[in-house]
Amino acid sequence: MPRPTLLIIGCGDVGCRVLKLLQGRWRLLALTSSPERCAALRALGAVPLLGNLDEARTLGRLGALADAVLHLAPPPAAGDDDPRTRALLRALARGGRVQTLVYASTSGVYGDAGGALFDETRAVAPASARARRRVDAEAQLRWFGRRSGVRVSVLRIPGIYAADRPGGHPRERLQRGTPVLAAAEDVYTNHIHADDLARACVAALCRGAAQRVYHASDDSGLKMGDYFDLAADLCGLPRPPRITRDEAQARLSSLQLSFMNESRRLRNVRLKRELRLRLRYPTVADGI
């Protein structure tokens, strides 16, 4: 029986972890806009394809090449929609071969939930342009799945961490001494180890249901300050200073503040029951 073919769009850190998991089991293709990355992708068992989601003319052949697509590419950095996903779906529709598509979205589509614990049936309420672009991408993918019959699954992903992920370990922030909110004003955050996220991507490719959303999150359920306190203790570093929200407004960047303005806790029952994923790092204490 021939091996199925997977095309990865946006093959960065998580995509490379997926390649390692699927070597020898799938025929692997990876879209890249950088010729310099081709050798590294080949070393991981993938056939590199040069193309750019911002240049639709480079995508024409994609739809006829793969049985499944893992879409890990982010939207552009500006605007309220995602033209990259639109260009990709047009290319895939022309080929007619793709049967399965998994999209890596963000839990930011929910906006602020006031610390509530909820599952994937909660309505989206994006509070930033960054999140609105993701909501637009999800809507495009749902429409594409219904129209074409492709089995589309969406992973809504929180903060990704791993010691070997660039910028993906709290140690760097702790060493900079970046403050966190005082306990009374702190927000809940959610996390997933990069290795578990790669495994969730594979599980969704194999077992994800059509038009189904899954929270790709671990079991931690920590507030942000508690997360960094735990990381500091595990790394043997000083705990970060605590400041009020008013002080944070004056001292932190708009991007840092955006993560402090949203509080939510993600249920991951579907991830475990439907995708049958057993987390290797169920809490950040296991993975840091």
Regions found by a protein language model. Name each.
Residues 15-16:
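N-terminal Rossmann-fold NAD(P) dinucleotide-binding loop
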Residues 47-54, 258-288:
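C-terminal amphipathic/interface module of NAD(P)-dependent oxidoreductases
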Residues 62-103:
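NAD(P)-cofactor binding segment of oxidoreductase domains
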Residues 87-129:
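Conserved Rossmann-fold NAD(P)-dependent oxidoreductase catalytic core, especially the SDR/UDP-sugar
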Residues 114-154:
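Catalytic helix-loop patch of NAD(P)-dependent Rossmann-fold dehydrogenases
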Residues 142-188:
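NAD(P)-dependent short-chain dehydrogenase/reductase
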Residues 171-179, 186-220:
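Alpha-helical substrate-binding/gating segment
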Residues 200-201, 207-256:
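Mid/C-terminal beta-alpha module of Rossmann-like enzyme folds, strongest
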